[in-house]
């Protein structure tokens, strides 16, 4: 863990303990996650590193409430500490909630995600502005005028020039780097506590990769967001992580 980041128990946002997840397959039960444990603190960056099939994505899908239908949480807990809409401190075990309830209550609002390929993350039939406004209108109960104003501000915050013009454009009219900035803007639309970045630079060229990582770090510092990176790129880890969890065959084998 980076010496620059000091963990404080009162700032713990997420606490995963002894999580075990299996999948029903045609060949029997497959144990995908085997007793993993890690914490995420306010303003911290945790990188989960591992090869394909190590269990990184299954872990994140469980947090987001989007675990595949043949997946089963056998044991363990995922304690999420957050502040509700009335300003009250709350603590909930996501394992005890239905996936539908997690998605409705937290996904896109308190816990947001940046996917690796912006072209598959964005709807080609909707303007950039509408896609950023959508989570605000759904979760924050603001007027369309307020959502539009905040969207234009967000486009500026993520480094997109002439945001009023971009608001009306479609994804195919933007470069790959700009599309990824839009995906980040969508993720930040409702001021989440946790931002999960799933290989956010894989689909981009090297020069754009560095700019996107710098952007996420700047926004994290400005908004005091906790970030989880899912990656196999140790170069990314070296640049951004305060804490690293290495996964292999469903276990965290090194921290």
What are these regions (language model features)?
Residues 9-13, 22-35, 66-72, 84-91, ...:
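A short, flexible loop at the N-terminus of ABC-type nucleotide-binding domains that lies
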Residues 146-165:
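Conserved ABC ATPase "signature" region
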Residues 77-105, 143, 214:
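ABC ATPase NBD Q-loop/coupling interface
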């Amino acid at each position: 863990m980076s010496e620059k980041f000091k963990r404080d128990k009162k700032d713990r946002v997420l606490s995963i303990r002894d999580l075990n997840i299996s999948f029903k397959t045609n060949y029997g039960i497959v144990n995908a996650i085997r007793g993993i444990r890690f914490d995420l603190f306010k303003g911290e960056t945790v990188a989960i590193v591992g090869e394909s099939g190590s269990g990184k994505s299954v872990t994140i899908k469980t947090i987001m409430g989007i675990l595949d239908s043949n997946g089963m949480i056998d044991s363990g807990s995922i304690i999420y500490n957050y502040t509700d809409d009335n300003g009250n401190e709350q603590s909930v075990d996501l394992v005890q909630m239905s996936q539908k309830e997690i998605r409705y209550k937290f996904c896109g609002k308190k816990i947001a995600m940046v996917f690796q390929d912006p072209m598959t993350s964005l709807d080609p039939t909707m303007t950039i502005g509408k896609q950023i406004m959508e989570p605000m209108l759904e979760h924050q109960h603001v007027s369309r005028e307020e959502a539009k104003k905040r969207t234009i501000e967000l486009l500026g915050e993520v480094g997109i020039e002439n945001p009023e013009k971009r608001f009306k454009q479609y994804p195919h009219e933007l470069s790959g780097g700009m599309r990824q900035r839009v995906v980040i803007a969508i993720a930040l639309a409702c001021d989440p506590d946790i931002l999960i970045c799933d290989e956010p630079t894989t689909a981009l060229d090297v020069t754009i990769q560095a700019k996107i990582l710098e952007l996420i770090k700047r926004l994290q510092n400005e908004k005091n967001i906790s970030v989880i990176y899912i990656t196999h790129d140790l170069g990314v880890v070296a640049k951004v992580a305060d804490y690293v969890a290495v996964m292999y065959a469903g276990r965290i084998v090194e921290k």
